[in-house]
Curated annotation (Swiss-Prot):
UniProt source species: Candida albicans (strain SC5314 / ATCC MYA-2876) (Yeast)
Domain notes: Contains a beta-propeller domain involved in specific binding to phosphatidylinositol 3,5-bisphosphate (PIP2). The L/FRRG motif is essential for the cytoplasm to vacuole transport (Cvt) pathway and for the recruitment of ATG8 and ATG16 to the PAS in nutrient-rich medium and in both its recruitment to and dissociation from the PAS under starvation conditions.
Motif annotated as L/FRRG motif, chain positions: 318-322
Protein name: Autophagy-related protein 21
Subcellular location: Cytoplasm; Membrane; Vacuole membrane
Amino acid sequence: MVTINDLSFNPDYSSISVSTSDGFKIFNCEPFGEFYSSQESPLRKSISNSLEDSAGCQNPTHSKTDSQDTPARFPTAFLKMLFSTSLTIVVPQTQDNLGNRLLKIYNLKQNLKICELNFPSSIIDIKLNRKRLLVVLDTGQLYIYDLSCVRLLKILQLSFNEHDGDQKFIGDLSADDSSWLIIPVQSTNNQTDLLNAETGSQPSTPKLTPSDSVINTGSYSQYLEFTRNSSLSNLKKKNKLITLEDIKNDSEGWVVVYDTINLAPVVIFEAHHSTIARICISHRDNKVATASIKGTIIRIFDLKEFEGKVKVHKVKNLRRGHNLVKVNSLSFHNDNHILGCGSESNTIHLFKIHEEESDICTNENSEDRTNHNSDYEDSDGDTSKSSEDLNENLANLLISKPLDPVPMETEDKLSSSWFVKTKKLINNQYTSSIIKKLPYKDYFENLIWEPPQRSFAYIKLPEYAPHNEKDPRSNKVEIGFNNDLVFIASYHTGNFYQYQIPKQRGPVSSINEDDKREECSLISQFNLI
């Protein structure tokens, strides 16, 4: 039985690769079609021809006496593509206890191996763009390479929490040349060195030594950005230096944006109160999407530079649902107008995220707007609905008064201006003092500032994959986009789906959104195996 090890879109979603226990294949997404395979074919030149036997790599399971109709097996753990170029990263899958420690860089067009790297432990993830190659090991090391010359620049020492038997890397690398790496602060430890920008003389083939990491004692105060969600953080009261350990103790939901070009932190902000489960960065404009382990709220942080410093310009909150669920996929559309979210519920949600003109902030009032961004508290599952009802009643007690009956034609106008009036009312000092004493003050503030935004479209896959503790990726999907199409690749079946995105009729209102959500239409279905 063929096992899917990895599914991966290239950064512009034009191609998708599948790595299996038999080999790998690369497909064009639209129009769909296979254009490369590791298995021998008389119609296609294969990279298999240039794979030579090496230590740590399983030998091909065929001989010269084999029939030409019998495909060769080259088990592959990972395959990553650099946009639509011929440069490809391949990690062969091994059957021994040493793990997948060998990485090879190929030029597929010329069927030529450029170089290979051996690592001290097994590779669990790979990130790359035109400037940088990141290799993540199961022992917590993150290797940062200059891709242009495959030169090792830095090794970050991290800590990974094994969740549901799946040891994975939580983080993302921007596709543009800024090369920002976003990781949870909880993934750092006392040996994580984010402040030392010296590259030193690093060997092309890494060897793990105690000097690869430096004890972290530096101050990160200048990189902290406090949003409305973190306005009550104890870190604001500290006058002395703030270490990564201080940030970790404050909350589990802080994330750090790290510049892999200049090897220095960019900004650190609190995304959630709970542990971060998923991070995704947009293809442009520096938008960061995060999900916590609760999986009820997705947050999008718009990062912009003001006076030489990167700040959180705006926060958008997206309500995935009320039930606790594991979010396993987040993907931005190429134009940044849509965010796709997949979870173990087997439903994919599509959120409209582009800003209306009234939402755009100028440099003059950006700081004020940042302090007043809404930030919904993570849902607590079964009690979320009752909390909403309670806080809605509290809102009515504070901001409502008996009104005379109004004609039907004026009702819509009053409804549309309700949130504008309440935003002004919340600035009242007396009202603010009352809110601080409420048992559900966090949720109440969010209710006043901005109603929760739900998805405008969704996808129910024709397959059902129940959660399997032995295989955490059994119900995981990868999401890609191309204009008005959304691509879904399933780990469970190896199927590749193309769906039509419903046309958006104006801005998605936060009121009665359940009536406006539409199901995407299935256009075509293929198999990647």
